[in-house]
Amino acid sequence: MKIPSSNSAVLFHKLSTPDMRFYAFAAFLVIVFLTGGGSRDDIQSLIILRPLAILFCAYAITVKAADQWKGRMFPLYIAWSLAALMAIQLIPLPPSIWSAMAGREIFAEIADMAQIEQPWRPVTLSPSKTLNSLFSLSVPIAAMMLYLNLEEGRRRQAIVVFISLALVSLVWAAFQLSGSLRSPLYLYQITNNGSPVGLFANRNHQAVMLVIAIVMLGWYAASDEPEAKFTKAKLYGGIAMIFVILPLIFVTGSRAGLLLMAPALVAAIILIYFRRYLARKRPAMEKGEMAKSWLSSQKVFIFSMIVATVALATMAVYFSRSLALDRLVGSSEV
């Protein structure tokens, strides 16, 4: 039965509303966290994730808000260029051209010795791996396109969605620490058993995600004006979550996470200071000694953040749960 055009227009309008575009982004982010926790090409959940990513790409293009994309296309251009490069490598070439390319001599010699006629071959020596890499780009491309369709206010909420999912992975990792090495809480067959990998298959993925969450929490903690509602709750809640994340990065055993943690923490402190405190410095100075005292208390607070962070890191190392530090200095074989 043919759907009337008026009904199609109504459906398109509903699917293209700002709220629906945000829900689509949030849903896709949840799907990625639940099914895209590994980089291996034999993970079964990729059968679900990648086709859905392509569908979300189609949705993002269909409801594209041109004014939202303007001036923000550079990351997409990079991703599309990579996809084009991979697609070119899959184009079959005639034997004469393929055999003349660098690194193909041994294949041509084997074919001559076996008296096998050379077929048309793609540029890549591993078509399956190249095809896997090509389809893997569907996930970041879909995420970028869905994010570009969001309005400014919704983009702020999108960061909150990411932080929430990061905290879910953190809590999941904490439960993994309390279980056995073969606990069913590990979602992937090939994983870092014994490490708090959360919703991921690899300790590095979990640690880097937590590092990103630190920066986002720094932004979130100071994202509102000081007079806004619940601004203090967001500030202290965001900082408290940073303190919760820091020891777990040590425990993951990820050298990448350990090395990136310090600059991420510095970035979070800078975001909090410049977005929340420094912006009020000039009017505060005009208010007299009380404002100066207020500013001084905030400086003490930031200094306390640094001291508390160092203390937490020291405790993690002291109690011998810092596998990341052991691996970094070469005292661990894992």
What label would you give each PLM region?
Residues 61-71, 87-103, 114-123, 181:
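Transmembrane alpha-helix boundary signature
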